[in-house]
């Protein structure tokens, strides 16, 4: 299948080109030419299928023309070596727990899939080395770094904002070594993202080394996130609650909700979506006004959503032909300051004995306030609460158990290189490699 750029000024690309390049030549994001609806019999029997089988059927619709069936199946089955259970929190609100992978965050799905797909293309082409640049506000760095760890022919550079990532998150990508290098940038997440984008646009740098991105701008990162929306629906169907399903997605860079919207286009029976923001509510403001006005990000306790200019908004706009009315018809918004996020975490722990992380709390609250009669809500619980241990403990007034997977990272020694937010320094560093 061919991929086109959201800016419509670049040549169409094959899947391999889209994955290896990451960003189109005109700075646009790649979109598949077609989103194929899955047959009705798939939805009729979806509740009898396991996660890996469902994911393979979805992956085949996107990637089947470009990747041999046995290879694609192996990539999907290797990626999803963990469960994504749907857990009942209240009578009509369920949590889709996306934190059972190696780094306890939803990004394990996209990170692991992309690492395996890129590895396949590199082997196929006999390429020597591909360099992956990834900007992170926390979970992306750990998921991508761990997904790519030890993959031959790939070196990963993780750029993260100094002092703005929790210690647990930082340890997950600064202690790995091997083919992973952590760069500690004296700036914000938006500065890190700007450095990555500038690197792709620099001709001299791209002649010096093969670069690609592992942020959700890469189709191999964001499309696999559609897998768990289908699996969530399958589990809801098993529970006899699949009627009017509403999915709420805590949203930062908007890759996650975009994957869900792709699922809806493939026929997934979701009534509507809610995009839940923290104070960085650029999308919420767009829904209210019809004007997209990016602004510098503000630090909040839901730090993975501290994004002032969400990259994937371009994909949402493209999907709906630029129509504000069409977007508003399928997606509503919610926005919460830290006080309300904390209050929700405290109440849900007290009333339901369910521990939310700050991002999941935004999702739960939007459903609690926005579900209509007869609807069933699913919110995406995107990371394990222990990844935000200090914040969560302060809010609920109790100790949070750290899973063994995280404890193992905490025992590692941090190794990172300091970097200014100026592109010339970053370029000089990469040119010296």
Predicted segment positions?
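PLP-dependent amino-acid enzyme catalytic core
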Residues: 1-433
């Amino acid at each position: 299948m061919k991929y086109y750029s959201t800016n419509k000024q670049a040549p169409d690309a094959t899947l391999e080109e889209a994955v290896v390049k990451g960003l189109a030549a005109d700075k646009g994001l790649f979109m598949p030419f077609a989103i194929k609806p899955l047959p009705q019999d798939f939805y009729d029997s979806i509740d009898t299928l396991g996660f890996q089988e469902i994911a393979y059927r979805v992956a085949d619709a996107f990637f089947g023309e470009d990747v041999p069936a046995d290879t694609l199946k192996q990539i999907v089955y290797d990626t999803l070596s963990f469960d994504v259970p749907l857990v009942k929190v209240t009578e009509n609100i369920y949590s889709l727990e996306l934190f059972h992978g190696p780094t306890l965050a939803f990004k394990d799905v996209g990170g692991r899939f992309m690492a395996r797909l890129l590895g396949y293309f590199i082997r196929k082409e006999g390429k020597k080395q591909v360099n992956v640049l990834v900007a992170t506000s926390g979970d992306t760095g750990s998921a991508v770094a761990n997904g790519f760890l030890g993959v031959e022919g790939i070196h990963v550079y993780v750029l993260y904002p100094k002092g703005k990532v929790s210690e647990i998150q930082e340890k997950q990508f600064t202690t790995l070594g091997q083919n992973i290098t952590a760069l500690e940038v004296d700036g914000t997440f938006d500065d890190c993202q700007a450095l990555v984008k500038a690197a792709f646009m620099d001709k001299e740098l791209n002649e010096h080394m093969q670069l690609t991105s592992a942020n959700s701008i890469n189709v191999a990162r964001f499309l696999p996130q559609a897998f768990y929306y289908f699996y969530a629906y399958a589990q809801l169907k098993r529970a006899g609650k699949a009627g009017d399903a509403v999915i709420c997605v805590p949203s930062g860079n908007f890759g996650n909700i975009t994957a869900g919207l792709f699922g809806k286009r493939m026929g997934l029976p979701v009534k509507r979506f809610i995009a839940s923001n923290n104070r960085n509510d650029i999308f919420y403001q767009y829904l209210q006004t019809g004007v997209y006005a990016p602004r510098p990000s503000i630090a909040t306790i839901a730090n993975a959503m501290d994004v002032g200019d969400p990259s994937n908004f371009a994909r949402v706009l493209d999907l709906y032909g630029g129509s504000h009315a069409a977007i508003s018809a399928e997606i509503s918004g919610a926005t919460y300051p830290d006080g309300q996020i904390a209050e929700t975490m405290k109440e849900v722990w007290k009333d339901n004995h369910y521990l939310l992380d700050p991002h999941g709390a935004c999702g739960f609250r939007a459903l609690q306030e926005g579900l209509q009669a007869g609807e069933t809500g699913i919110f995406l619980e995107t990371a394990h609460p222990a990844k935000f241990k200090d914040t969560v403990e302060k809010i609920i007034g109790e100790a949070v158990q750290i899973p063994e997977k995280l404890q193992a990272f905490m025992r590692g020694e941090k190794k990172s290189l300091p970097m200014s937010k100026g592109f010339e320094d970053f370029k000089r560093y990469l040119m010296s490699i």
